[in-house]
């Protein structure tokens, strides 16, 4: 009787072990346990390692450093420049097998982009896009467009179209490239061909979003060309819409009504190749101060609340004391502006005189 009981116990334990083993093999998942994961997934490598001389419909393997959330892939993979592509992929835990589209042109570098919708299995999203170039050519296109985004914004996207387009076309035609610049104030497009481009910065991007209803910024001209090489200092300024500015202004006025507020003063001088009238803006997330710069380049700002600020000057072409970022309804593009290279810390009851600020406008490309 005792022997039968021991045999039954052994069989039960063996059965439990086999059930656990097969259950663990039934689905693709990473080992459990360890510290809480709060680090976004990272790209390890691709196979082939360098995706040149690629053939249409060729299979490539993309390996990450951890297991991914399979459900996040659907809205996370895009190919640029934009088009109707018949690619497909297969999820394999920390790897993705991807079969490239059949309709690939020979003379352009494409990009597989994993956007910030991509998550690992612990629901941790990417903080910035992962970009993987591939081409049917032996080398990648090497031209770049880069710059900075200034102002007060929660998110930022840079949109790029082939050719010099009218503004009504930009409103109604999807961009050829989209770059999510939300995690940084700088941006850079890589692997671009030697073509002409139109460019726009927006706070929000999506297929159903009207660019005119959200903060946007044109560049100061509509003719960007990479035919003579790469471009840098293609800078934008995103600021709140008028309704949002009015709400902030009311809050600021309430704050300034308090008694015995001690303030700071900022003075200095600018010089360079600019056209008057030229204005000055000192700004942080809570406060903004502005004034005209005198003909001799001197300026003064009074009544500044203590804090850290960003300083910029701009050519006020239409003399309305506003840094205009262009319009979809007129031929106006963004006004030229320059940002002081360092942030300024102002203390109450202090006067800060900054060194003479000299800047020069390079020849337009």
Predicted regions mapped to residue ranges:
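Acidic, low-complexity Ser/Thr/Gly/Pro-rich repeat segments typical of extracellular/periplasmic
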Residues: 26-191, 196-200, 213-219, 225, ...
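Intrinsically disordered, low-complexity segments enriched in Gly and acidic/Ser/Thr residues
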Residues: 291-307, 313, 318
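A short, solvent-exposed beta-strand micro-motif common in secreted/extracellular proteins
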Residues: 108, 195-206, 307-318
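C-terminal motif of bacterial Sec signal peptides marking the signal peptidase cleavage site
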Residues: 21-24
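Conserved "repeat-terminator" motif of extracellular CCP/Sushi domains
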Residues: 136-140, 233-243, 252-264, 350-356
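Bacterial N-terminal signal peptides that target proteins for export
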Residues: 2-15
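Structured interaction patches on ligand/partner-binding surfaces of diverse proteins
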Residues: 128-129, 204-242, 317-356
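Structural motif
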Residues: 148-158, 258-263, 267-278
């Amino acid at each position: 009787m005792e022997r039968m009981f021991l045999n039954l116990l052994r069989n039960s334990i063996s059965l439990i072990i086999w059930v656990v083993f097969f259950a663990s093999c039934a689905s693709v998942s990473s080992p459990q346990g360890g510290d809480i994961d709060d680090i976004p997934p990272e790209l390890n490598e691709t196979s082939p390692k360098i995706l040149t001389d690629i053939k249409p419909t060729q299979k490539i393997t993309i390996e990450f450093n951890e297991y991914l959330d399979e459900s996040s892939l659907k809205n996370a993979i895009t190919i640029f420049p934009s088009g109707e592509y018949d690619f497909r992929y297969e999820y394999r835990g920390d790897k993705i097998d991807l079969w490239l589209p059949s309709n690939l042109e020979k003379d352009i570098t494409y990009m597989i982009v994993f956007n910030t919708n991509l998550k690992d299995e612990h629901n941790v999203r990417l903080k910035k896009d992962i970009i993987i170039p591939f081409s049917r050519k032996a080398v990648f296109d090497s031209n770049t467009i880069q710059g900075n985004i200034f102002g007060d914004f929660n998110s930022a996207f840079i949109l790029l179209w082939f050719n010099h387009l009218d503004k009504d076309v930009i409103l109604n035609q999807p961009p050829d490239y989209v770059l999510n610049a939300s995690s940084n104030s700088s941006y850079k497009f890589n692997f671009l061909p030697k073509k002409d481009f139109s460019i726009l910065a927006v706070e929000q991007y999506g297929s159903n979003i009207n660019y005119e209803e959200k903060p946007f910024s044109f560049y100061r001209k509509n003719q960007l060309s990479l035919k003579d090489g790469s471009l840098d200092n293609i800078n934008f300024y995103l600021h709140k819409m008028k309704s949002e500015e009015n709400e902030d202004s009311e809050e600021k006025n309430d704050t300034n009504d308090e008694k015995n507020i001690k303030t700071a003063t900022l003075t200095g001088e600018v010089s360079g190749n600019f056209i008057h009238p030229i204005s000055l803006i000192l700004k942080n997330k809570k406060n903004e101060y502005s004034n005209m710069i005198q003909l001799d380049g001197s300026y003064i700002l009074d009544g500044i609340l203590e804090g850290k600020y960003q300083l910029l000057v701009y050519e006020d072409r239409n003399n309305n004391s506003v840094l205009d970022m262009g319009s979809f309804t007129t031929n106006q593009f963004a006004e030229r502006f320059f940002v002081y290279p360092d942030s300024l810390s102002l203390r109450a009851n202090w006067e800060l005189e900054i060194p003479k600020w000299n800047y020069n406008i390079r020849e337009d490309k």
